[in-house]
Amino acid sequence: MRKRTGKKWNTGLALLLCLAGLSGCQNASGLPETSETEQEERIQIGITFDSFIIERWQRDRDVFVSAAQELGAEVNVQNANGDMEEQIAQMDYFIQKEMDVIVVVMVASDEDESGLIEAVGRAQKAGIPVVAYDRLILNADVDLYISFDNVQVGRLMAEHMQEHLGEGGELLQVCGPMADYNVPQVMEGFEEVLGNSNLKIMETEYAEEWLAETGFTATGAYLKTHYEVDGVMCGNDSIAGHAVRALSECRMAGKVCVVGQDADLDACQRIVEGTQCMTVYKPVEKLARRAAANVSIVSLV
């Protein structure tokens, strides 16, 4: 364990990386100058992920670790496997190891978040800044928040549906869990665009803990009562894949406009096949690299 040198942490800093421009970030060349002693002491970053079931998080992990190492930092990666208590334990482990900064991809579940909020407070009390990566920890005074413009993601989904279903139609929404702060933001952008269209949201379902199979069960249940649907808005491409599976069982795949986000490889293949209309590509590589650079800055402030 390393002895702390009385650094003052810059609390209350908030940063939003948008799809358009990823502005407001300082690059690696803008890192504060450090003494030879500090340069010899590599920055220790602890990062805890919700899980790696969703393909996108694997990409974030790999790029973040690579970028941080290029900047001279060491990264300890932990996987909470969708368990809030496990994520809290991982944060306490990072505190015990006296990490320079802790990065959290919050577990998106209906579990009480008070324990996670308290863990953020314990880290900051120990002089360790906490960064919320792509999922804001509500009611926690994190030092840095890094994400995309999720409202714009919703707008892009709706705009494509509007173009594809110009004469109007009935839609099913299968969103992620409301426990994920990004979900209501995406819905806000989606519904904002639909307010000026002939498209109508008939039903909204939520995939708790981002359970992708909800796409199959929700779409199948909807078709049993409504018999047809013109479009399915899915919270991500994993959910979209299962929605397409349900449509296939009803011989409707390719006839219904299905949209998602993350640009997973399977989604791109479905687009080529014609069973998924579009996916919102979010430059996670750019986000992860900018995050690594800014996390390094926060650790030196």
Model-found features: residue ranges?
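Sec-dependent N-terminal signal peptides of Gram-positive bacterial secreted proteins and lipoproteins
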Residues: K8-A28
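A residue-level marker of the well-folded mature domains of exported/periplasmic proteins
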Residues: K3-G6, C25-V301
